[in-house]
Design a protein with these regions (language model features):
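Short beta-strand boundary microenvironments
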Residues: 113-197, 206-235
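"Rare, low-scoring activations can occur
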Residues: 105-107, 112-123, 186-193, 203-292
Length: 317
C-alpha cells in the first residue's frame, strides 16, 4: 500500500506539472481581454475553463480519498496490533526500556521494585526485549538433536503474569508454570491441523511440552505471522524491558514517579522521559502516520485551490 501511495503522489505531481505548463503556455499566448471576456468563437463556451475546473475536482477527490483511506488504515492497524488490549489499556501501560549495558541486572531489579512502591501501579510485566521491536527466538526442533527438524516459529520468553497482563485468553489446556512448559497460539495450531497439546519441542539446551493454546498474538501486520510459542522467562538472568500497567486516574502521577527514579539512576545523557505502550505502536507505524500527514496537507491545499477555482468561475460568469 505504501508503495502504491508513493506512486500516486509521483503521478499526481507530474500531472499537476503538466497542467501548470499547459496553462502557462496558454496564458502567454492570450491577451488580457481575451482571457477575461473570451474570443468571438468561444464566447459562451468556456470549455477550457470547465475542463481545468474538472481536473481540479479530480485531483481534489484523489487526495481526499487517499486521506480517508490512510486514516482508516492507521486506525485498523492500531486496533490489530496487540488486539487483546483495549485502546485504554495501551494508553495506560507505560513502556520503560532497561537494556542498558552499564546497569547490572540487580540494579534493574531494584529499580523495578521502586516502581512497584507507587499506589497507582496495578501490575508490572518484565521482558528480555521490547515486544514491538523483536522476539526472543525464531526456531524450535521437533526431534531432539536432529538439526533437520528445526521449524520456523516466533519464540517469546514471558513471565507467569504475561497472559493476564496482556489479556490473552488460554483457549485450550493451561498457562505456563515451569521452564519445560510451552504455550502455542492458535495461528500455529491451525497450521498443524491437529491437536498439539502434549507435543514435544526442543532447542539447543532445553526440551518443552505444549501445555496450552492461547488466542493469536499479533505484533506485526506487514510480515507473515507464522505463529508464536511462549516459554517461561527468568528475570533474574536479564531484564531488557519493563511494562507498567497503571490505574487510569493515577497514570500521570506514576509517570512522574518513574521519571524521578530514572533521573536518579541513569546518566544525564539518557532521557528520563517515560513513554506509553501506545507511543511504541505509533513509532512502529511512523511511516504510515507521516504519509497520512503529508496526504492530509495536500488534500487541504487541493480543496482550497478547488474552492478558489469555483469562486473565480462564478465571478467571471
Amino acid at each position: 500500500l505504501l508503495k502504491h501511495i508513493l506512486q500516486y503522489i509521483v503521478f499526481l505531481a507530474l500531472l499537476c506539472m503538466a497542467v501548470c505548463l499547459l496553462v502557462s503556455v496558454r496564458i502567454r499566448r492570450s491577451s488580457i481581454q481575451t482571457g477575461i471576456y473570451g474570443g468571438q468563437k468561444r464566447r459562451g463556451k468556456q470549455w477550457g475553463r470547465n475542463f481545468m475546473l474538472g481536473v481540479q475536482f479530480f485531483i481534489c477527490w484523489i487526495f481526499v480519498t487517499l486521506t480517508v483511506s490512510l486514516f482508516l488504515q492507521s486506525g485498523k492497524v492500531t486496533e490489530t496490533l496487540f488486539h487483546t488490549l483495549s485502546q485504554e489499556d495501551k494508553e495506560t501501560i507505560l513502556s520503560i526500556p532497561l537494556d542498558y549495558p552499564f546497569l547490572e541486572n540487580k540494579e534493574k531489579q531494584e529499580m523495578v521494585e521502586r516502581f512497584r512502591q507507587h499506589v497507582g501501579v496495578k501490575d508490572i510485566l518484565l521482558s528480555d526485549i521490547s515486544y514491538t521491536h523483536g522476539i526472543s527466538g525464531n526456531l524450535l526442533m521437533t526431534e531432539k538433536g536432529n538439526d533437520n527438524s528445526w521449524i520456523d516459529i516466533n519464540v517469546m520468553c514471558v513471565p507467569l503474569n504475561f497472559f493476564t497482563f496482556m489479556n490473552i485468553p488460554i483457549t485450550e489446556g493451561r498457562t505456563i508454570r515451569t521452564k519445560k512448559d510451552l504455550v502455542m497460539d492458535e495461528v500455529w495450531q491451525k497450521r498443524q491441523k491437529k491437536d498439539i497439546i502434549g507435543m514435544n519441542f526442543y532447542d539447543q539446551t532445553s526440551d518443552f511440552t505444549v501445555c496450552g493454546v492461547c488466542a493469536p498474538f499479533q505484533t506485526d501486520v506487514h510480515n507473515h505471522n507464522g505463529g508464536y510459542a511462549f516459554t517461561l522467562y527468568d528475570s533474574s538472568e536479564y531484564i531488557g524491558h519493563c511494562y507498567v500497567k497503571c490505574y487510569p486516574e493515577q497514570q500521570k502521577e506514576v509517570m512522574k514517579w518513574m521519571e524521578t527514579i530514572r533521573r536518579e539512576v541513569l546518566p544525564e545523557n539518557i532521557s528520563s522521559q517515560v513513554r506509553t505502550f501506545q507511543d511504541d505502536l505509533y513509532e512502529v507505524q511512523a511511516v504510515e502516520y507521516i504519509l497520512k500527514d503529508i496526504i492530509s496537507f495536500f488534500a487541504i491545499v487541493s480543496i482550497i485551490i478547488t474552492l478558489l477555482g469555483v469562486y473565480s468561475s462564478i465571478t467571471l460568469d
